[in-house]
Amino acid sequence: MMKFFEYNWQVRDQWFTWCHQLTTEELLKNRLGGVENILYTLFHIIDVEYSWIRAIQGKEDIAVQFADYQTLNKVKSLSNTFRTEIIDVLQTHSDQIKDELVSVPWETGVLYTRDEILHHIIAHEIHHIGQLSVWARELKLSPVSASFIGRTLKPIHSY
């Protein structure tokens, strides 16, 4: 599972680099499909990842407002800031605690295992990154490669 977090983070960082070719206006332009626009999609991925990780830790969810992150650099900085805490959770995940039950503040009376949550985080990011690829092609630009094969992944602990 760790390899998929490494993959997602590498692809996310490549999308941040890819986004530098667009203006802030283009990044914020509402589009068909997905969640509004390119910048908000990246923000949403980061926000959801962090909310689930905090739930695993038994911590209160922090409501991060997109209005405070209206530039590419601010969203990238948010991603980097949250990774520190996320790394701690990922490095302590093991087979012994993967079935530990977690409640989330946004769903009353529902429990998930740590393992389910981590798999959901991975799938959620891959899903939304796919939408970025669609929008890139609509802009007549090449998207970031989604291929897992042939990547040299940076270990989680090195972020």
From Swiss-Prot:
Binding site for a divalent metal cation: 44, 124, 128
Family, similarity comment: Belongs to the DinB family.
UniProt gene name: yizA
Protein name: Uncharacterized protein YizA
InterPro entries reported in the protein's UniProt record: DinB, DinB/YfiT-like
Any Pfam family hit: DinB
Source domain of life: Bacteria
Record-linked PANTHER family: DAMAGE-INDUCIBLE PROTEIN DINB (PTHR37302:SF3), SLR1116 PROTEIN (PTHR37302)
Keywords: Metal-binding
Organism, scientific name: Bacillus subtilis (strain 168)
GO molecular function terms attached to this record: metal ion binding
